[in-house]
Amino acid sequence: MSEQYSNDFKLNAAMAAIVLSGGVIGYAKSKSMPSLIAGSVFGLLYSTSAYYLSQGNSKVGLGVSVLASSLLGGVMGKKAIATSKPIPIILATGSAFTLLSSGKELYNIHKN
């Protein structure tokens, strides 16, 4: 793995764990299939991003991260505004941070 992208790898791996566990917890607490499905899908996207970053394919890894973060941020941002509940706010903030980090690195790759 490139040392340059190790922080992005860690961030995407952490987001994968957070959203996947959140989906499982949401299902366990309230039998929410949408939480389980969304947690699984976004967990898979962030895991895919982390995998590609660990293999040195930074363009694909960062691209998948930007995609996942944009989608999750949009969905959770809308939900955070509507409900003011802490979980959507945390997920929207985390995805925004991941989007900024991965987007900046992806921009730098394409700029050079």
Curated annotation (Swiss-Prot):
| Protein topology in the membrane | Multi-pass membrane protein
> Where's it found, cell-wise?
Membrane
Has the keyword Transmembrane been applied to this entry?
Answer: yes
Q: Which UniProt keywords apply?
A: Membrane, Transmembrane, Transmembrane helix
**What biological-process GO terms show up in the record?**
regulation of heme biosynthetic process
* Keyword Transmembrane helix tagged: yes
Q: Which residues cross the membrane?
A: 9-26, 36-53, 60-77, 87-109
Major place of residence = membrane
Q: InterPro entries, from UniProt?
A: TMEM14, TMEM14_sf
Q: Pfam families from the entry?
A: Tmemb_14
Q: What Gene Ontology cellular component terms go with this record?
A: mitochondrial membrane
Family statement drawn from the similarity comment of this UniProt entry: Belongs to the TMEM14 family.
Protein's recorded name:
Transmembrane protein 14 homolog
Source species, please? Dictyostelium discoideum
